[in-house]
């Protein structure tokens, strides 16, 4: 699994946990709909740290909380080049 796929999966899990819509996350985070679609559909080759910070703020959690998930601890996690 790539880092980008892991971020998309983490977003999906948090949306479900918080009973939150993707639209609301876009509004709260300031991420454009098209950009969010690219992240969620795997068309985005690189998710920047700035984007992850915006996502965390959209969920009203810290960056540490966003990244504190076993999905990011996998030794099989790959980076895109």
Regions found by a protein language model. Name each.
Residues 1-21:
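A short, Lys/Arg-rich alpha-helix, primarily the initiator
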Residues 15, 26, 56:
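The alpha-helix within a helix-turn-helix
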Residues 15, 40, 51, 67:
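DNA major-groove recognition helix of helix-turn-helix
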Residues 16, 30, 41, 71:
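Residue-level detection of the helix-turn-helix DNA-binding "recognition helix"
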Residues 20-38:
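Short alpha-helical DNA-recognition segment
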Residues 38, 67-81:
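Short, charged recognition helix plus adjacent turn
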Residues 43-57:
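Short, basic-rich loop-to-helix N-cap that marks the start of a DNA-contacting helix
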């Amino acid at each position: 699994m790539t880092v980008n796929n892991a971020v998309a999966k983490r977003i999906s899990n948090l949306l479900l946990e918080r009973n939150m819509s993707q639209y609301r996350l876009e509004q709260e985070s300031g991420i454009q709909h098209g950009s969010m679609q690219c992240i969620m559909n795997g068309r985005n080759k690189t998710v920047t740290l700035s984007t992850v910070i915006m996502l965390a703020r959209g969920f009203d959690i810290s960056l540490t909380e966003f990244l504190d998930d076993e999905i990011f601890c996998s030794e099989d996690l790959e980076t895109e080049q």
